[in-house]
Amino acid sequence: MIWFLKIKMKVLTTLFLLMFSIVYTSAQQSLEGLWKTGKEETIIEISFSNEQLIGKIKFSNNKEVDVGKIILKDLRSEGNKWVGKIYAIKRKEWYNVEIISKEEVLELKISFGLMSRSLQWKKSKS
């Protein structure tokens, strides 16, 4: 009877670890893809590079924007959100950012000093 309980515990442990890894992997991939920033027609591509999640400018109709420039870096998962750094092109500075993924929308909260600003990026189909 004890051997049966040991086998049952091993199976349950394996199933738990498998479910945890699937949930963790899907959270890791939730930011990946193309995102429209809003006002300007700028598209950011979020992907893994050297085992880190980064965001690069893929396209923009704004001539001041350097296509290919990294604007999101040091992203790491913390619970239900991602934290890292975002580059403000107009100010030419890096700021802290929190990102929450909600289906087809990314909610970004950018912190600078005692102030913060919120943005929404929408999933791009192209």
Q: Which residue ranges define each predicted feature?
A:
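Bacterial Sec-dependent N-terminal signal peptides
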Residues: M1-Q29
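Short glycine/proline-enriched turn or capping motifs at secondary-structure junctions
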Residues: K10, T14, F112-L119
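Central antiparallel beta-sheet cores of small beta-barrel/beta-sandwich binding domains
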Residues: Q29-N96, K122
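Short, conserved beta-turn/loop elements at beta-strand boundaries and strand-helix junctions
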Residues: E51, E104-V105, S126
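Short coil/turn motifs at secondary-structure junctions
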Residues: S60-N62, M115, S126
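Short, exposed beta-strand-loop hairpins at the edges of beta-sheets
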Residues: E98-S101, V105-R117
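Short beta-strand-to-coil "C-cap" segments at the C-terminal boundary of structured domains/repeats
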Residues: Q120-S126
